[in-house]
Design a protein with these regions (language model features):
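Subset of outer-membrane beta-barrel
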Residues: 21-337
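Positively charged n-region of N-terminal signal peptides that target proteins for export
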Residues: 1-5
Length: 337
């Protein structure tokens, strides 16, 4: 009985947090199209595939699972020549809590344009837009209700007493973003960007009422440089804010090349800190145009007791379809934000 009551309480905690904020990743730098639409197409290569999977709080029956896959490419090359970049992309995202009690599906299309500010393309100013379609469903069969408790324990076969087993809502959404980026002889790179989502404040109510989604603002920035001929250091941070939640993350990643001459393979290690919530160690491997990253959120928030101090496991994959480096509109350092 105690375990069932614990599961009931924690289910509603998770559901309230899931509806209070958008899906997000600890490896925000590995998911460009969810971070800022102005990043669309801004990389060295023909096309880019990126995917991230997140599994949070496994100790309480896996209430949070998020996955995304995205593709973007540089477009209209004959129109936007030299160092100016116009990119198009698409993204699909799936998010669920309480083993499917709340499910969210997102399908988004993005476009971004980055204009060089000097003759060498060392400084750029970009803007991006995102249009998406969102579908959300609540399945009452996945939750626990008081009518399902008996004197001898919990019986999931008993009816929930709810008039409907599922509720759902569908709506379009829009977002935009800006980005300033610069490089110095490809040895140093810096950037700062901002994105703004839920411009139209869509109505999320599943019962015919009004529950407008609060706009969300994201500010992100970073700086990286070559520590020596065989290594690089990356520093980045993020601030997200809406009417009902906020988040601050900062951290650093160290990259060590394994081959002095080609520098095609490397190992990466670092750590990030999410304010008042988690410490996030990171490890990664880069081989040619493929990169894999693994991180784990160590929970330090007020929920650490209920979650048994377990946080979120996250896996990111990225592959860039490369071409002749001499024909790239941007240097390879842009492949990491």
């Amino acid at each position: 009985m105690r375990d069932a009551l614990f599961a009931l309480l924690f289910s509603f905690i998770c559901l309230s947090q899931a509806t209070a904020q958008d899906p997000h990743f600890s490896q925000f730098y590995a998911s460009p199209l969810t971070l800022n639409p102005a990043l669309t197409g801004l990389f060295a290569g023909e096309g880019r595939i990126s995917s991230t999977y997140r599994n949070q709080w496994q100790s309480i029956s896996n209430p949070f699972t998020t996955g995304t896959v995205a593709f973007d490419t540089r477009a209209l090359r004959r129109v936007f020549k030299e160092q100016n970049v116009f990119g198009l992309g698409g993204m699909a995202l799936y998010d669920q809590s309480n083993n499917g009690g709340l499910r969210s599906r997102y399908l988004a299309f993005t476009a971004g344009y980055n204009q060089q500010l000097d003759k060498y393309g060392h400084h750029r100013l970009g803007i991006g837009f995102q249009a998406s379609f969102v579908s959300k469903t609540i399945d009452y069969n996945k939750f626990l209700f008081s009518r399902q408790f008996t004197p001898i324990g919990f019986d999931p076969s008993l009816p929930t007493g709810e008039p409907r087993s599922t509720l759902n809502v569908n709506y379009p959404d829009m977002g935009t973003g800006i980005l300033y980026s610069g490089i110095s002889n490809t040895e140093q790179q810096w950037y700062i960007g901002a994105s703004y989502y839920h411009i139209t404040r869509p109505n999320e109510s599943m019962t015919g009422g009004e529950a407008k989604l609060s706009p969300r603002t994201t500010i992100h920035a970073g700086y990286n440089f070559s520590a020596n001929e065989m290594s690089k250091l990356y520093f980045s941070g993020l601030y997200m804010n809406s009417a009902i939640s906020s988040e601050v993350m900062i951290g650093s990643i160290y990259q060590q090349y394994l081959n002095f001459y080609e520098k095609k393979s490397s190992v990466l290690a670092g750590v990030y800190y999410r304010h008042n919530e988690s410490i996030i160690p990171y490890a990664g491997l880069e081989s040619g145009d493929f990169q894999i990253g693994l991180s784990y959120d160590i929970n330090i928030s007020s929920l650490r007791t209920a979650s048994q101090s377990r946080g979120g496991f996250e896996l990111s994959l990225q592959y860039v379809f490369a071409k002749d480096p001499s024909k790239n509109a941007v240097p390879k350092c842009y492949n990491k934000f």
